[in-house]
Amino acid sequence: MNFTNLLIEWYLQKKRDLPWRNTTNPYPIWLSEIILQQTRVAQGMPYFYAFLESFPTVKELAIADEQQVLKLWQGLGYYSRARNLHQTAQYIANELDGVFPNSYAGLIQLKGIGEYTAAAIASFAYNEPVPVVDGNVFRVVSRYFGIESDISAGKTKKEFTALAAELLSKEQPALFNQAIMEFGALQCVPKNPRCENCIFNTSCLALKNNKVNVLPFKSKKT
């Protein structure tokens, strides 16, 4: 069984039951992605529910007072995320009649949405075959393929994105993207991963070459 199919099979057995995974509605998916930037799932979950309860739709978020949004955000830090969230909701409500762009190309034009978030929403909501590349993906791919490129370099991001696009299941892009991120979050963790219990322990090059703890490689800033 190849990497992609094995990964998806693992995910279907081991995945966490997270509320934003049970929908293709772009609004809660977008909310979850913004909340979870720089934030752990356990910490972000109550905020996700609070925002959905207070603002069930993007239009209701748009008409909210900014101070109300910031108050609900209190404790998460990085308040520019909350301001961008509110401004983007207003743009979608007022300029797009409350309808999210339905493609990566359209989503990435929105304020506060970068390459990763656009890819996540496009694949999870619309099943568009675009790869997500975050810290988890860097780690899984660099270890499995034994890639020692410096992940702080811009060209490395392109290298990993191209490789992730090759691995991506064109039939099930949302499932694959969720699977590779979940694998990095639960199994292929940054420190002391339990490689003896890993589905890839006979094919992972980092394990074979005793480089699990040094990959992915990131140069120290001088």
Q: What is each stretch, according to the model?
A:
Residues 3-196, 200-214:
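Catalytic cores of DNA base-excision repair glycosylases
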Residues 217-222:
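Short, intrinsically disordered, charge-balanced linker/junction segments flanking boundaries
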